[in-house]
Amino acid sequence: MTKAQLFGKPLADDVTRGVRAALKEWAGAEPGFQPHLVSVLASEDEASRVYVHSKARQAERLGVRFTARDLGADAKQDELHAVLQALSADADVHGVVLELPLAPGLDADAALRHIAPCKDVEGLTPANLALIAAGREAEALLPPTPRSVRFLLREVLGDDLRGRRVAVIGPGRTVGRPLTFMLNNRGVTVTLCNECTRDLRDVLAPQDAVVVAVGHAGLLRPEQVQPHHVVIDAGINVTPGGVVGDAVPDLPVRAQTPVPGGVGPLTSALMYQNLVRAVKLQRGERVE
């Protein structure tokens, strides 16, 4: 059995309090002002719809204006670019999210280039990722899911992650790739794995933690982990029985994030923290 369940809600609550404080301050100074977040869908991906519904619920609780633009799975690349460019140019829109993955045939890398970096609350535009890769995180909007993973690792391993060894399974655009740089920026030795990695048990054995973010239910199994491991499950898979992660539940490890309830709540809170930061960047205000 898992020795510790690592829940994201306590950390998410702390972040949300800061977001509420910023929104309250704006409401007092500018009655009627609401930051506006727009989520753009161009696929039939069920996991993306789960994320959108979660964002909408959180926006309603916070008092943030939220709009979902569903272009459908048959959207054309030029149409997607035009929508993202229009949202980026709209002064009434403060944050833009492109829900990934896109429908087959659509180029996510090309589409992300059409989101203004200062409205990129998911931190996935080339400009923000370049700052992260260069170790200039203070100037960027950081991707919320990798940032959630780093927060949760610190909860168990301590604030100083220097010298720790972490395996990241899944070199994806939204989690694995940016997380690799973000952990490296904190002095972590990162081993990047994928679904084709051979002898995964041996690769994982010396690691302090394992982060899995592939989108493959049951990918990480009991025979592949060690009792000293901290497992952060950033996978999301929609099954007939509900939403599950990439790791088998209740692994025999030191600590494990459940799905749902682990990475997800903190990711949502950090995205809205990014929205606050984005508003300040767009207004030319000082950003901490």
UniProtKB/Swiss-Prot annotation:
SUPFAM superfamilies in UniProt: Aminoacid dehydrogenase-like, N-terminal domain (SSF53223), NAD(P)-binding Rossmann-fold domains (SSF51735)
Matches recorded under Pfam families: THF_DHG_CYH (PF00763), THF_DHG_CYH_C (PF02882)
Residues annotated to bind NADP(+): 170-172, 236
Record EC number: 1.5.1.5, 3.5.4.9
Cited Gene3D superfamilies: Leucine Dehydrogenase, chain A, domain 1 (3.40.50.10860), NAD(P)-binding Rossmann-like Domain (3.40.50.720)
Pathway stated in the Swiss-Prot or TrEMBL entry: One-carbon metabolism; tetrahydrofolate interconversion
A GO cellular-component term linked to this record: cytosol
Record's function text: Catalyzes the oxidation of 5,10-methylenetetrahydrofolate to 5,10-methenyltetrahydrofolate and then the hydrolysis of 5,10-methenyltetrahydrofolate to 10-formyltetrahydrofolate.
Complex formation: Homodimer.
Protein name: Bifunctional protein FolD 1
Annotated source species: Deinococcus geothermalis (strain DSM 11300 / CIP 105573 / AG-3a)
